[in-house]
Amino acid sequence: MKKICVLGGGAIGSCVSASLTDAGLDIILVDQWADHINKIRRDGLSVTTKEGEKNTKVSAYHMSDLAKLQPQFDFILMAVKAYDTQWMSKFASVYLKDKGVFVGLQNAYNDDLNADMVGRENVIGAVVELSCEIFNPGFVQRNTVPSGTWFAVGELSGEITPRLKEVQKIMLNVGKCDLTDNIYGAKWTKLIANSMTCPFSSLNLKNWEAVKLPGMFDFSVGVGRESFKVGKALGYMIEPLFGLTNEDIGNAGEDAAELVMKKMVKDVGPNARTHAAQDHIKGRRSEIEFINGRVSKEGRKLGISTPYNDAVVEIAKMTHSGKIDLDPSNINILFKKLEELIRD
């Protein structure tokens, strides 16, 4: 049986680990959060969905354990924040077999960075549609059940290979999983979706609450339209997400961002918070600079104005620095920042 390591025991990594363990695969979870690993070792990993709670005896290890055990893995599935990409993938490279496969189950655009650390020939890209949250050691809230969870996996070269099908087979234990010959386009499409929910991050609200605030839905659609425009200028072929088809996206035209936003808010359920909102609640750095910030950065290179994404980045900086507290009233600061950027 092939040996699998899930590197990163946050919400995504924990959900994936539980599902793969339940499927009977040879998998271990590795993380630097000592309390989480110790709790799992002692009491198992509890995953709660709308269908109930399930406790799974996941094999969990501290990162320091690997130095002693020196394991070699056929597959490493890395589920860490974008800002931890390079050092974590370098750490992982020591434990990946020569012809092993490294898959980044991450937001943002990290596959080329991962390739620099573990070798391009070892990397497969992935897109993740799985909403989940973790605030306490050993307990995960999974907002999308397996039937509503979706992955796409693709070779960086665009080829459909036997090893890609192996990764698909693994991920089918967690949710639906498609093969793509357009992983860069698929990754940008997910970045578009993430960019539209990042404006919620400083409001201390769940997604469905945030989107009901006056003007918030339209603001998020504005963010998405900019992200679509920049992606198109970069030459990325946009992929359908959230059960939408190419025909749905094509027929929507300029309203594609609005269509995606409506479908996304509907699918993730009433308890979901955007990943950036979870980070802010924990007092941690978010990935906004790697999502909306990436749109802004590429927009500047292309001469495309991105005031909506720029405003989201600026508000995130204010949150990170402690200049503003998490509160629904921050929507007014967000709108004011947008007005300033448009005037400039």
Predicted regions and their residues:
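Residues at the C-termini of beta-strands that transition into short coil/loop
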Residues: 31, 51, 64, 106, ...
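NAD(P)+-binding Rossmann beta1-loop-alpha1 motif at the extreme N-terminus of oxidoreductases
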Residues: 1-52
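NAD(P)-dependent Rossmann-like dehydrogenase/reductase catalytic/cofactor-binding core
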Residues: 2, 221-344
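Anion (oxyanion) recognition and catalysis
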Residues: 21, 41, 171-172, 232, ...
